């Protein structure tokens, strides 16, 4: 066991006041080796700091630390598995495989026998999670790991087998996922939930519901996963029906996450009565005083269901000490949706007086309010300049879109075109598309042609652009030009997505 000198202990304590990476470099620069306990404490403390995780990885595999502790196999696992876990769940999951490979090589170099390194089931659990990480999923690596887990005798380890099910589902391989699931000697609620989640993410709600029915002990996660899945794929009626069924079930009660999942379905339908019912339910369950996320979502739902009065009443009932930036932004956005520009601006100024600084989403909300509420151009530009100069927020395409929207609503299309040309952002097709819509309103075919040329430079596969330009030509009597655009659409194989309505 290696002990720290007093100088090194002092350095360790300075972590709280010095930049993490600089302090870490100071600790290891003289070549002294960490103790296992110290390594573990660093992992626990900085598991979300990717830079320090990389430094620990480097020190772990290159400094001789592993060789000095080679007799403490359990110690190596305690150090290796947390590093692996951080990588598998983080932004660089492939580093988990690099680390695993390095440890194998070091083991072969340090031991006379050539047996497999002393990894445990958690090692392969984290490697499987790395292979199913949404950022860089790798079914090929996962299949290789499947074979290795069988060779090592982990077919009876429920968490390893559950990770295999998840890996196959993330890779879209439902057949092998079912096979692993069916062959498992033991399944726990996590296994069932992984299966339900995977099927829901793949859009197979029928099978997901089938597994929900078969599940021996349903959990709130099981219900919420499918409810959230329905809401995300624009099936609000199905989400609400399943939520109603869940509420009627005595054994399982919705939690805060369930409420956050169902509210988008409620406002998607614009069902004010259902919104009130959900509000009454969460009040009865005591969620509103406890969870500000539920409170903010209810404000948003009331506004999007068309009842700005209920949204505002609910907002003012919340003590200022509980309101966060999302609360204020939600209410400002609610006023913007209803064209109440003055009220939104007043709300923004109240927020500033309380010392809350807006973020870029807040600024989009207040700029939209100025545009939709018909406020003076000077007031809009004042907020835009405040955002840039006082709050140091760099405008993105949505902020510029608000500016173009304000100008187009006032019929100043040429000025809007100049702004669109000057936007220093590549992803600006949405701004040009907004301007093309304004050309349709004002029957400005000449400007529409220029705008369409810009859109074609950025994105040629958007069917709506061709159709809108064709309609503008028809509206100004240029039928041959309209026919030409329709032919271009056919030649380029561009499809127009059909519209749909939920009104029955």
UniProtKB/Swiss-Prot annotation:
Keyword Transit peptide attributed: yes
Targeting signal (transit peptide) range: 1-87
GO molecular function terms listed in the Swiss-Prot or TrEMBL record? RNA binding
Q: Which GO terms describe its biological process?
A: RNA modification
Q: What are the GO cellular component annotations?
A: cytosolic ribosome; mitochondrion
- Where does each PPR repeat begin and end? 76-110, 120-156, 157-187, 188-222, 223-253, 255-289, 291-321, 324-358, 359-390, 396-430
Q: What is its main location?
A: mitochondrion
The keyword Transit peptide is annotated on this UniProt entry = yes
Q: List, alphabetically, the Pfam families matched.
A: E_motif, PPR, PPR_2
Q: Where in the cell is it found?
A: Mitochondrion
List the residue ranges forming a coiled coil, or say none: none
Q: Which UniProt keywords apply?
A: Mitochondrion, Repeat, Transit peptide
Sequence segments annotated as region (Type E motif) = 431-504
Q: Which domain of life is it from?
A: Eukaryota
- Give the PROSITE patterns listed for this entry: PPR
Cross-referenced InterPro entries: E_motif, Pentatricopeptide_rpt, PPR_At4g14850-like_plant, TPR-like_helical_dom_sf
**Similarity field:** Belongs to the PPR family. PCMP-E subfamily.
Instruction: Give the protein's recorded name.
Output: Pentatricopeptide repeat-containing protein At1g09220, mitochondrial
| Source taxonomy | Eukaryota, Viridiplantae, Streptophyta, Embryophyta, Tracheophyta
């Amino acid at each position: 066991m290696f002990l720290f000198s007093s100088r090194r202990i002092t350095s360790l304590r300075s972590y709280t006041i010095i930049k993490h990476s600089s302090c870490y470099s100071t600790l290891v620069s003289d070549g002294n080796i960490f103790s296992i306990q110290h390594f573990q404490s660093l992992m626990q403390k900085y598991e979300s700091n990717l830079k320090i995780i990389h430094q620990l990885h480097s020190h772990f595999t290159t400094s001789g630390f592993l060789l000095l502790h080679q007799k403490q196999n359990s110690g190596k696992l305690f150090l290796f598995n947390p590093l692996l876990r951080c990588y598998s769940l983080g932004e660089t999951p492939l580093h988990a495989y690099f680390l695993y490979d390095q440890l194998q090589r070091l083991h072969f170099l340090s031991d006379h026998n050539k047996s497999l390194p002393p990894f445990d089931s958690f090692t392969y659990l984290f490697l499987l999670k790395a292979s199913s990480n949404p950022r860089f999923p790798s079914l090929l690596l996962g299949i290789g790991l499947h074979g290795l887990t069988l060779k090592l005798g982990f077919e009876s380890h429920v968490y390893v087998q559950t990770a295999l099910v998840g890996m196959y589902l993330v890779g879209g391989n439902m057949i092998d996922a079912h096979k692993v699931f069916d062959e498992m000697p033991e399944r726990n609620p996590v296994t069932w939930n992984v299966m339900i989640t995977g099927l829901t993410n793949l859009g197979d709600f029928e099978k997901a519901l089938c597994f929900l029915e078969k599940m021996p002990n349903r959990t709130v996660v099981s219900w919420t996963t499918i409810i959230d899945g329905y809401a995300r794929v624009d099936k609000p009626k199905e989400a609400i029906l399943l939520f109603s069924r869940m509420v009627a079930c005595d054994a399982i009660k919705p939690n805060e996450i369930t409420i956050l999942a169902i509210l988008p379905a409620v406002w998607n339908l614009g069902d004010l009565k259902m919104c009130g019912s959900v509000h009454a339910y969460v009040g009865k369950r005591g969620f509103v005083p406890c969870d500000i996320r539920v409170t903010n979502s209810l404000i948003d739902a009331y506004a999007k269901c068309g009842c700005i009065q209920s949204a505002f009443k609910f907002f003012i009932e919340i003590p200022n000490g509980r309101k966060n930036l999302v609360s204020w932004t939600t209410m400002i956005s609610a006023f913007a949706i209803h064209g109440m520009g003055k009220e939104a601006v007043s709300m923004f100024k109240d927020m500033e007086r309380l010392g809350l600084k807006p973020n870029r989403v807040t600024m989009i909300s207040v700029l939209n309010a100025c545009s939709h509420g018909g406020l003076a151009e000077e007031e809009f530009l004042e907020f835009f300049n405040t955002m840039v100069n006082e709050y140091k927020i760099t405008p993105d395409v949505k902020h510029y879109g608000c500016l173009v929207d304000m100008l187009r609503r006032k019929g100043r299309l040429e000025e809007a075109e100049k702004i669109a040309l000057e936007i220093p952002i590549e992803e600006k097709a949405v701004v040009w598309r907004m301007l093309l819509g304004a050309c349709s309103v004002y029957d400005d075919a000449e400007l529409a042609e220029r705008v369409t040329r810009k859109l074609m430079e950025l994105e040629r596969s958007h069917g709506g652009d061709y159709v809108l330009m064709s309609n503008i030509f028809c509206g100004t009597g240029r039928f041959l030009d309209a026919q030409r655009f329709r032919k271009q659409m056919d030649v380029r194989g561009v499809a127009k997505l059909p519209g749909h309505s939920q009104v029955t």
